[in-house]
């Protein structure tokens, strides 16, 4: 009799994905972030479900319902802060996962990469709508500013914004629909993640060398299951340190003030994980130009495979490209820092330079450097 693990219609899918999956023998800890993202997603769905049981999506009671969760619900405070800081951990894992893909040339799997980009956009949309729900000052004004960007679209812009708002300003209708979308999107993300994995398992994982590893495969379990469990333990340790010792470290104090349409906060800024894109948006004095740059700052990932000019897939043996990659990382840190600063000299100039550098590295310097490295190989 065959093992039920290999014969049962449902269990064999799990078996072929997480147990008997042939995996390259040399994938490093940078390959842990896929499983960590899965854990983050499950954690967010579970904590979000329990929060939704006590939250009310109404402008008059939303803020006090969040306070009620923290004060009166059993362990409500830990659920709320795990959800809020879980989003930060989610984005840390996302950025590292995308960075790994760029460094080791994982974008050469086009289907997996493109679904990954769709996932990134969906997660960003979900996080943005979730930030609006507590209905604090930064929730309200963040929603107003970001949705208002759509008015830059010629001809239909204003109508589009009012359609999204469900009125002439961010109000009860906006909050209700944002709650509905914030609830449904994680399940769409879950479905997309399954498709992401499906395409990945068609080709098999990439590895640090960027060369085929068919001749040297090992079973996923126990080798990588134990490695993933270690990653999960470290992730949970970091999350719980954040939640239990400084839960508001990454939040904005303005969000502890109930939303007031008559009083604008001095500095409107999104959560830290959107700051790099926010800086690129602010760096262009023209509204439509800023919006296009904002979208393109993420969408640029979609054309990365077309810009791959190197004869080698991975950057492991390409020191010049490595220098550019780490310059890009430093540039993203700079953009993130500038996004949290007021719009004044010298921050405007630094932000503009960092924005130009971001696009220059990805569109011009990296492909050009790869060609130089190809020629150096001939020596």
Swiss-Prot record:
Q: Does the keyword Transport apply?
A: yes
Q: Where does heme b b566 bind?
A: 97, 196
Q: What other comment is given for this protein?
A: Heme 1 (or BL or b562) is low-potential and absorbs at about 562 nm, and heme 2 (or BH or b566) is high-potential and absorbs at about 566 nm.
Keyword set includes Electron transport: yes
GO molecular function annotations of the record: metal ion binding; ubiquinol-cytochrome-c reductase activity
Q: How does it sit in the membrane?
A: Multi-pass membrane protein
The protein here is known as Cytochrome b
Localized where?
A: Mitochondrion inner membrane
Give the binding site residues for heme b b562. 83, 182
Quote the InterPro entries the UniProt record gives.
Cyt_b/b6_C, Cyt_b/b6_C_sf, Cyt_b/b6_N, Cytb/b6-like_sf, Cytochrome_b, Cytochrome_b_C_euk/bac, Cytochrome_b_N_euk/bac, Di-haem_cyt_TM
According to the record's subunit comment, the protein's assembly and interactions are:
The cytochrome bc1 complex contains 11 subunits: 3 respiratory subunits (MT-CYB, CYC1 and UQCRFS1), 2 core proteins (UQCRC1 and UQCRC2) and 6 low-molecular weight proteins (UQCRH/QCR6, UQCRB/QCR7, UQCRQ/QCR8, UQCR10/QCR9, UQCR11/QCR10 and a cleavage product of UQCRFS1). This cytochrome bc1 complex then forms a dimer.
Where is this protein chiefly located? mitochondrion
Q: Which UniProt keywords apply?
A: Electron transport, Heme, Iron, Membrane, Metal-binding, Mitochondrion, Mitochondrion inner membrane, Respiratory chain, Transmembrane, Transmembrane helix, Transport, Ubiquinone
Q: Which cofactors does this gene product need?
A: heme b
């Amino acid at each position: 009799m065959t093992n039920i693990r290999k014969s049962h219609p449902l269990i064999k899918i799990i078996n072929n994905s997480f147990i008997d999956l042939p995996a390259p023998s040399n994938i490093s800890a940078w390959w842990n972030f896929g499983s960590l993202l899965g854990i983050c997603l499950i954690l967010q769905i579970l904590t979000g479900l329990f929060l939704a049981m006590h939250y009310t999506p109404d402008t008059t009671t939303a803020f006090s319902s969040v306070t009620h969760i923290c004060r009166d619900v059993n362990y409500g405070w830990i659920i709320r802060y795990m959800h809020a800081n879980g989003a930060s951990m989610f984005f840390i894992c996302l950025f590292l996962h995308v960075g790994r893909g760029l460094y080791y040339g994982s974008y050469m799997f086009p289907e997996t990469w493109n679904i990954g980009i769709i996932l990134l956009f969906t997660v960003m949309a979900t996080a943005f709508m979730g930030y609006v729900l507590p209905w604090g000052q930064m929730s309200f004004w963040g929603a107003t500013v970001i949705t208002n960007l759509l008015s830059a679209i010629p001809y239909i812009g204003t109508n589009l914004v009012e359609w999204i708002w469900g009125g002439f300003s961010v109000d009860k209708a906006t909050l209700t629909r944002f709650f509905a979308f914030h609830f449904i999107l994680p399940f769409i993300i879950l479905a997309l993640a399954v498709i992401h994995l499906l395409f990945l398992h068609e080709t098999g994982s990439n590895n640090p060398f960027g060369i085929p590893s068919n001749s040297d495969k090992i079973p996923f379990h126990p080798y990588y299951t134990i490695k993933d469990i270690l990653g999960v333990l470290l992730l949970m340790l970091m999350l719980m340190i954040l939640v239990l010792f400084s839960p508001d470290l990454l939040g904005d104090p303005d969000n502890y003030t109930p939303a007031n349409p008559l009083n604008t906060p001095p500095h409107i800024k999104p959560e830290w994980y959107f700051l790099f894109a926010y800086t690129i948006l602010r760096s262009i004095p023209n509204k439509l130009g800023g919006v296009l740059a904002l979208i393109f700052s993420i969408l640029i990932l979609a054309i990365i495979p077309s810009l791959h000019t190197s004869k080698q897939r991975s950057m492991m043996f390409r020191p010049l490209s490595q220098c550019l990659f780490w310059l890009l990382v430093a540039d993203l840190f700079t953009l993130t820092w500038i996004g949290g600063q007021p719009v004044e000299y010298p921050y405007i100039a630094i932000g503009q330079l960092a924005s130009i550098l971001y696009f220059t590295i990805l569109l011009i310097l990296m492909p050009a450097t790869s060609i130089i490295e190809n020629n150096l190989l001939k020596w």
